[in-house]
Amino acid sequence: MKKLLLLSAFVILSCQDKKIDSTFDFDQKNYSEAFQLIEFWLEAQKDYDNLPGLTAMIADQDGMVWSDAFGMQNENEEMNIENTFSICSISKLFTSIAIMRLVEEGKIKLDDPIEKLLPWFNIDNEFKESKPITIQSILTHSSGLPRESNHPYWSYPEFSFPSKQEVIEELKNQQMLYPSSKYYQYSNLGLSLLGYVVEEVSGDSFDDYITKNILEPLLM
């Protein structure tokens, strides 16, 4: 029903009695009607997906041209454009770029075993015929590692993401799912380990490395 109402609203707004100006300069930054549609759609999408709140922005080559916040950040406060969110798996993009930068600089190789770079790595591997768990096998989600670290951080809001030390301590209680480089298995644990590789090899914290080598050069 909500999708039908949303579609109807778009049709009504699109069919308003307007003359089309064939001389319109598409370089003009007059996006007010588009922004109105975006705001309406985001508000409806928030309700349809039962989201408590969200923020959104649009930017072009000259900077931000539109932003807005919708819903609540908690029971008493409305969302605002300054609210921050965990980017979760988007961090895999930055991790992969950082790893490939270190490869290009000759500091690591794609076929380096993870044990070479993280001496504390000690997961139980019953597959004696398994190939080494390499940087490449982790990047391609074919390492044989479990999907998650041994923590319930997806279970309830009060469970935060595990610290590096917690990941290290729990590795010995986890097992490989299959021999490395044999099957595909999405692994958040694997990409977390590559984040630790970035720290070990560069000497910087993950946040500092990403900021200095990716975000700042891109003026982000």
Q: What do these predicted regions represent?
A:
Residues 29-87, 120-123, 169-174:
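Short, conserved catalytic-motif segment at the N-terminal edge
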